[in-house]
């Protein structure tokens, strides 16, 4: 099979997602009800968000493909950063020199750098450089992501789970947003 490339970023191929399932006899198979190639949603003018999977319950109901039906519905109307009681798996392609707005989400986000080097910057001014394979655990903090390269795209994968509202010294922090969207819309993590 030929390598599928993004026209805007030829160094990053279009990601695929393969969903396993069971046939009528209980044998493990690949589900073919949804195309493997992940569609891209352009956010903030240029960055691309690929919704790899999403669930709305925990534990996840795998009976009668309930989770696949739920995920399929999100392909036409993407979920927000997190889903109440569920999970969101997303691949984010960050343009050269791209930077999100400073934002806070009521979620815990596990982010892994797949390509490039990405800065994770906190509102305190602290920052870390994440290189390929590095992991960030973002715990509802005010933060932004920045691609360190001005010539190459960066790619991260995020698993996002809903979190309880954060309270510090009796005050609720709430979900402060970035990218011009609220916590229930498809913004970055």
Swiss-Prot record:
Keyword Transport in record: no
Annotated keywords: Virulence
Keyword DNA damage: no
Entry's family note: Belongs to the oryJ family.
Function noted in UniProt: Part of the gene cluster that mediates the biosynthesis of the phomopsins, a group of hexapeptide mycotoxins which infects lupins and causes lupinosis disease in livestock. The role of phomC' within the phomopsins biosynthesis pathway has still to be determined. The pathway starts with the processing of the precursor phomA by several endopeptidases including kexin proteases as well as the cluster-specific S41 family peptidase phomP1 and the oligopeptidase phomG to produce 10 identical copies of the hexapeptide Tyr-Val-Ile-Pro-Ile-Asp.
Protein name: Phomopsin biosynthesis cluster protein C'
Gene behind the chain: PhomC'
């Amino acid at each position: 099979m030929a390598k599928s490339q993004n026209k805007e970023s030829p160094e990053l191929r279009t990601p695929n997602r393969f969903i396993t399932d069971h046939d009528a006899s209980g044998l493990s198979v690949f589900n073919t009800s949804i195309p493997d190639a992940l569609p891209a949603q352009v956010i903030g003018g240029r960055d691309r968000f690929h919704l790899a999977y999403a669930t709305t319950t925990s534990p996840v109901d795998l009976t009668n493909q309930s989770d696949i039906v739920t995920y399929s519905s999100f392909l036409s109307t993407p979920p927000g950063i997190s889903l109440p009681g569920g999970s969101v798996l997303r691949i984010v392609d960050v343009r050269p020199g791209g930077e999100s707005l400073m934002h806070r989400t009521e979620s815990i986000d596990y982010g892994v750098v797949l390509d490039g080097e990405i800065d994770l910057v906190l509102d305190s001014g602290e920052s870390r450089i994440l290189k390929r394979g590095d992991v960030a655990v973002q715990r509802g903090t005010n933060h932004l992501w920045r691609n360190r390269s001005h010539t190459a795209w960066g790619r991260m994968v995020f698993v996002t789970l809903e979190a309880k509202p954060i309270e510090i010294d009796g005050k609720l922090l709430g979900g402060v947003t970035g990218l011009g969207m609220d916590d229930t819309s498809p913004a970055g993590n």
